[in-house]
Swiss-Prot record:
Protein name as catalogued: UvrABC system protein B
InterPro entries according to UniProt: Helicase/UvrB_N, Helicase_ATP-bd, Helicase_C-like, P-loop_NTPase, UVR_dom, UVR_dom_sf, UvrB, UvrB_inter
Xref: Pfam families: Helicase_C (PF00271), ResIII (PF04851), UVR (PF02151), UvrB (PF12344), UvrB_inter (PF17757)
SUPFAM superfamilies linked: C-terminal UvrC-binding domain of UvrB, P-loop containing nucleoside triphosphate hydrolases
Helicase C-terminal domain residues: 431-593
Family matches, as HAMAP family: UvrB
Signal peptide as annotated in the record: none
Domain UVR intervals: 622-657
GO terms under cellular component: cytoplasm; excinuclease repair complex
Length: 657
């Protein structure tokens, strides 16, 4: 049962939209659209729709900042349910590629984020275990995963009193991808101490599952906090999932290896016939090494390129994705596409770019042809999935409107009574000086400023210039990872700095009630960043504050500017009439600032600054131990054993306090 927790009730405008959407979905309509202005409470409307329908829901968005914000909000809305987070676990990713013209092969290079990997595994585990799941996902949901039926077939179910020999249990754990590690115990590891076995599930954060045996009988089972060395909740039954969505059973693995060998022989015969000896040798060496790894360990580097064989699909079949984990046992589910006017075009463009790169790798003997089936969903496959869709946007594109037909529900009024922001045109000749004067007034009121520019260079120079003038300002760019981006937004809201400058990162969905001034530099430069949709979305960031104002710096009024201003002014008239009718006085949105996503790093900073450890609460000390332990393991992996030993000694000191 999905249970919504909120101190607020939907406004009349929201109630009408919720009622219409729920009725449309219950009637069986596949597509519907919520057209809601910025600040009208679209997220709260989405939460109420989910509560009324009471079915598993996938919420997709096009960028990681918005995903992080949605995750925080829905964790609050559905605090008693399973709210999950599924975005790419790469902090950095360079896919393998080959450039024939220069004969340059670019090896795959990446760095993964362990926390994001854990959250992804938690998402699939929850989907296979519970019905009350809300999952926030990026475009990653469209990329290939393992077969959910094979994955669920690999689970290990523990029940008190069950009979299993230690040898058999350890073999099963290894088959599931868990590694024995009695010294540096970490996620996806297990350790053995006599009749006690500790298992650290790959999707857990701080706890392990401790199993106590009497001979071959499972005598006791409970959660155990490895940081605080404390016993947790007793368990009567526990389901353990594998360490990877690509894990497969022994039978399937043997068949996959057989199929890969057959495809390899066929491809080698082709290269030999075409007298392509370099490609022949390259492919033979690569695939035979991967086969050796698969045979001995069940995994290999780039295992996803053999996904077709591991999942048992045929050439050209639709790959398994997160959607298939939702649809397990033919379960009904809802897909909400947030900021659909941007998300859907992004989903549409994914397949072509991926295919072009991989085709070159196949042609030149770096990969087998089956690697082409390790791909994202084609747009038609995505949009025709066996589920129902709700598109959400302040500016839906023609595609959403066409698909939804008459099932379009408007949400123009804001529960707070806030109007669309006032728009002022300013001469772009003196835009830097004018903005400085306007920003000072806003900052004196303890409010914030967002600035959007067209180039990275201008953003950097503007940041440097305003810092010299004494304004606390930061610049947000595309190189910043998801967690750091969230920290910057938290910093702006909390007052750590007063102005944030960006290019295309300050548009859709960011909920920043403290921001009362939006400055759009060079607003008259027609293009993607200054289209009607972009302007309306950017201006909407000021619609959560009663003092909201937008400055458009320009030399002329473009068609896009005029359309954006006309739409905004028309909405202001409707909103003023609504406020008068219901006697509403506009008030700024009040929204608590979410906790940091990287508390562990902050605690590390406290420690390094010499905070007295004996005065630190036990819970904070435990988190600090966790951070130091992570650093110790990283040092050990890098063969920096002296550093690892020094960190170990610090951990022991902390545990002795």
């Amino acid at each position: 049962m999905l249970e919504l927790t909120s101190e607020f009730k939907p406004s009349p405008d929201q109630q009408e939209a919720i009622k219409g959407i729920v009725k449309s979905i219950k009637k069986g309509n596949k597509y519907q659209t919520l057209l809601g202005v910025t600040g009208s409470g679209k997220t709260f409307t989405m939460a109420n729709v989910i509560k009324e329908l009471n079915i598993p829901t996938l919420i997709m968005s096009h960028n990681k900042s918005l995903c992080a914000q949605l995750y925080s909000e829905f964790k609050g809305f559905f605090s008693k349910n399973h709210v999950e987070y599924f975005i790419s676990y790469y902090d950095y990713y360079q896919p393998e590629a080959y450039i024939p013209r220069t004969d340059v092969f670019i090896e795959k290079d990446s760095s993964t984020n362990e926390d994001l990997e854990r959250l992804r595994l938690s998402a699939t585990a929850s989907l296979l275990s519970y019905e009350d799941v809300v999952c926030i996902a990026s475009v990653s949901a469209n990329y290939g995963l393992g077969n959910p039926n094979e994955y669920i077939g690999m689970v290990l179910i523990f029940e008190l009193g069950m009979q299993i020999s230690q040898k058999e249990l350890l073999k099963k754990l290894v088959d599931m991808g868990y590694k024995r590690n009695d010294n540096f115990f970490d996620r996806a590891d297990f350790r053995v101490q006599g009749d006690i076995i500790d298992i650290y599930p790959a999707y857990y954060e701080d706890e392990v599952v401790r199993l106590e045996f009497f001979g071959d009988e499972l005598d006791a089972m409970y959660h155990y906090n490895v940081l605080e060395n404390k016993k947790g909740k007793d368990l009567k039954r526990f389901i353990l999932y594998p360490t990877s969505q690509f894990s497969v059973g022994e039978t399937r693995l043997k068949q996959a290896i057989k199929d890969i060998k057959a495809e390899l022989n066929e491809r080698l015969a082709y290269f030999e016939h075409e007298n392509k000896l370099v490609e022949y040798q390259r492919l033979k060496q690569r695939v035979e090494f991967d086969l050796e790894m698969l045979t001995s360990t069940g995994m290999c580097k780039g295992v996803e390129n053999y996904a077709r064989h591991l999942t048992g699909l045929k050439e050209g079949d639709t790959p398994y994705t997160l959607f298939d984990y939702f649809a397990i046992k033919d379960r009904k589910f809802l897909v909400i596409v947030d900021e659909s006017h941007v998300s859907l075009p992004q989903f549409r463009g994914m397949f072509a770019g991926d295919r072009s790169r991989k085709q070159t790798l196949v042609d030149y003997g770096f990969r087998l042809p089956s690697a082409l089936d390790n791909r994202p969903l084609m747009f038609d496959e995505f949009i025709h999935k066996n589920c129902q869709f709700l598109f959400v946007s302040a500016t839906p594109a023609p595609l959403e409107l066409e698909l939804s037909k008459e099932n379009i529900f408007h949400q123009i009024m804001r529960p707070t009574g806030l109007l669309d922001p006032l728009i002022e045109l300013k001469d772009s000749d003196n835009q830097v000086e004018i903005l400085f004067d306007e920003a000072k007034k806003v900052i004196q009121r303890n409010e914030r400023v967002l600035v959007t520019v067209l180039t990275k260079k201008l953003a950097e120079e503007l940041t440097r210039y305003y810092l010299e003038l004494g304004i606390k300002v930061k610049y947000m760019h595309s190189d910043i990872d998801a967690i750091e981006r969230n920290e910057i937004i938290r910093g702006l809201r909390s007052g750590a700095f007063d102005m944030l400058i960006g290019i295309n990162l300050l548009r859709e969905g960011l909920d920043l009630p403290e921001v009362s001034l939006i400055a759009i530099m060079d607003a008259d430069k027609e293009g993607f960043l200054r289209s009607t949709t972009s302007l309306i979305q950017t201006m909407g960031r000021a619609a959560r504050n009663v003092n909201g104002k937008v400055l458009l710096f320009c030399k002329k009024i473009t068609k896009s500017m005029q359309e954006a201003m006309d739409t905004t002014n028309e909405r202001r008239k409707l909103q003023m009439a609504y406020n008068k009718k219901y006697n509403i006085t506009p008030t700024s949105v009040k929204r608590h600032i979410e906790e940091s996503l990287k508390n562990e790093e902050d605690l590390g900073e406290i420690y390094r600054k010499g905070k007295k450890l004996e005065k630190m609460p036990a819970s904070e000390r435990a988190k600090l131990v966790k951070e130091l332990r992570k650093q110790m393991l990283e040092a050990a992996k890098a063969l920096e054993f002296e550093k690892a030993a020094a960190i170990r000694d610090e951990i022991n000191k902390l545990r002795d306090l």
